[in-house]
Regions:
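Conserved metal-binding segment of the jelly-roll/cupin
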Residues: 99-121
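Non-catalytic, conserved peripheral segments adjacent to functional cores
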Residues: 1-100, 122-123, 130-138, 142-180
C-alpha cells in the first residue's frame, strides 16, 4: 500500500495492495492495521457502501457530504475532481484532479467536494464507503466547465440528464457559497 498526500489537507491517494496470479487480481480494499501503520485515520465501521455504474461522459458530483468517504474505481477508468470547501481549512479553494483506475483509492475528508466523470467506453463502476449514512440535502456544488478551474476531460452539457442529474445541477454554483 502506498499513500500520497495532495494539495488538499486530509485528501489522500492510496495505491491498494494487489496480488495477481493466473486467476486474476485481488485488491485489498481496507485493512485497519495497514491503514494505521501508514498513518491514516481509523475509518470503521462503514455504515453505508454503494456501487454505482456510470456511463461514459456522465458526471457524478460535486458532492461535499458531512462525512468521510473512501472511493475507488472497481472497473473502467474515470477522472476524479476534488475541491476543498471547508471553512477555516488552510487549503480551502484548492483543487485536486486525478485519473482513477482499479487499484487506486481516494480518502475524501468531510466537507471536501468530490465528483467524477466516467471515461471508459463501457462505463465505470465506482465504489464508495461512508462512515455515516447518506441523507438527502447534503451539500454540493453545481457542475460547470468553469467550476474552480476543473478540467473535465470530456465535454459536459449540464442540461443533458444522461450526463448530469437534475439534483447535481440544482446545487448552488461555487460563487454562491459563503466565504471563509
Amino acid at each position: 500500500m502506498v499513500v500520497r498526500a495532495t494539495e488538499i489537507e486530509g485528501l489522500m491517494v492510496i495505491r491498494m495492495r494487489q496480488v495477481e496470479d493466473e486467476r486474476g487480481t485481488v485488491r485489498e480494499f481496507y485493512r485497519e492495521s495497514s491503514w494505521l501503520s501508514a498513518g491514516l485515520p481509523s475509518l470503521g465501521p462503514w455504515l453505508q457502501v454503494n456501487l454505482t455504474e456510470t456511463r461514459r461522459g456522465a458526471v457524478r458530483g460535486l458532492h461535499a457530504e458531512s462525512m468521510h468517504k473512501l472511493v475507488a474505481i472497481a472497473s473502467g477508468q474515470a477522472f476524479g475532481a476534488y475541491l476543498d470547501l471547508r471553512a477555516g481549512s488552510p487549503t480551502r479553494g484548492n483543487v485536486e484532479q486525478l485519473r482513477l483506475a482499479p487499484g487506486t483509492q481516494v480518502l475524501v475528508p468531510q466537507g471536501v467536494a468530490n465528483g467524477f466523470q466516467s471515461l471508459s467506453a463501457g462505463g465505470s463502476q465506482y465504489l464508495y464507503c461512508f462512515d455515516h449514512e447518506w441523507v438527502a440535502g447534503m451539500a454540493g456544488v453545481a457542475i460547470s466547465p468553469l467550476t474552480a478551474g476543473i478540467q473535465w476531460p470530456l465535454a459536459i452539457d449540464a442540461d443533458d440528464r444522461s450526463q448530469v442529474s437534475a439534483k447535481d445541477q440544482a446545487a448552488p454554483p461555487l460563487t454562491e457559497l459563503p466565504p471563509n
